[in-house]
Amino acid sequence: MPSEILLKIFSYLDAVSLLCAGCVSRRFYHLANDNFIWIRIYSTAFSPTRSNWKVNSVEKIAVSVSFLSVQDKEAGYWKKEYITKQIASVKAALADILKPVNPYTGLPVKTKEALRMFGLGWAIILKEKSGKEYIMEHVDLSVNDTSVTVIWYGKNWPCLASLSTLDLCGVTPVFMDWYKTPTKHRLRWHSLIAKYNLSHLTVSTMIGCDRLIRIFCLHPGLLVGVWKKEEELAFVMANLHFHHLVERSTLGSATIPYELPPHSPFLDDSPEYGLHGYQLHVDLHSGGVFYLCGTFRNLFTKKGNIENGHVKLIVIHLKNNREHLPLIGKVGLSWKTDILDGCIKSCSMMDVTLLDEHGKPFWCFSSPVCMRSPATPADGPSFLGQTYSVDYVDAEGRVHVELVWIRETEEYLIVNLVLYLSIAKINRWFGTEY
């Protein structure tokens, strides 16, 4: 068919159909880049009248000049301009929906709505040592109170021994309504969230196992399940905290993560500024089942509790029985693949949201954790039952939990919960010099 006829046909297509047509063949690709077609699509989608603007003479002249200069632009110029504008409009809409903040959690009120409305998803990119890549979109996810758990599984995993790294990316449709009708060739952009080294699947990172699989925890917040018998991948599970999740999943590039905006300290002349007024919300959960959901307000500490670059913030005191909390149900981390499922005892996901005295998120994370034995409470009361501990550590702080298994009631009891906050982070956040 003559190119003139094809161009005439293409001129009746919308942007999505035109992009799909460009994937058919090399000839169609070049024809679908026609600037005259794309400037019409661009002008219709982003015209001043469409945005309820008042069109003045300067704008009219600018539009006319744009049409006259079409031939001066390289092929595909107006297609790129249109896609760039679409991406910018999606980002602007995301920023707008995330403005309202929940005073209880310090997090955006409409995070769940944003995930749904904008078709946000996640993908992992498995890279072989040879350079070959495998892109896998998430199979399942569950939205929790302050995090989302994303799962990948299937039958076509590449050989684990050949893999070097795993990239976790947010995936967003360029056109906001595309996610409603999924297609293999839909136009999307990737935002790198984290990069993991798969050579770190060692004994030191293994946190649990059952008769079928072993699970490994890679920082930040990634859980990798490996079949015991075959020593191959069974599943990958990422637990992502809501704090800046949408921004991290949409505003980065395929190779560079989104960089958080610089924090401006709230200055205060209080002698112990930055050591009081904290609020902690902590969840322990797995598979939609919550073992703990607790909020602790008005937490404080003293300068005398600063040691080894951290300040000790006691949330649950070991010697105060009234503060001790039970975990609800049988603690275990649920997993599944396309053919099997199971539950690994004593493991779960931990979500921590620590707000400063102004109600701003100071330290947030979501990560797999496990209870380890033995861990005898120091200088504490004599408990009847096995003792356990849960520990998490990163560059900004450490969480230490001590638990006791009560045989009579068959439940775990939290008898001590302590946060160790980085003094360097406190000084940066509050402008102090501890």
Curated annotation (Swiss-Prot):
Question: InterPro entries annotated for this entry?
Answer: F-box-like_dom_sf (IPR036047), F-box_dom (IPR001810)
Keyword DNA damage carried by entry: no
* SUPFAM superfamilies to which the protein is assigned, alphabetical: F-box domain
Listed under GO cellular component are:
SCF ubiquitin ligase complex
Q: Cite the Pfam families for this sequence.
A: F-box-like
Q: Does the keyword Nucleotide-binding apply?
A: no
Q: Which residues form the F-box domain?
A: 1-41
Keywords, alphabetical: Ubl conjugation pathway
Q: What does this protein do?
A: Substrate-recognition component of the SCF (SKP1-CUL1-F-box protein)-type E3 ubiquitin ligase complex.
Know the name of this protein?
F-box only protein 15
The gene name reads: FBXO15
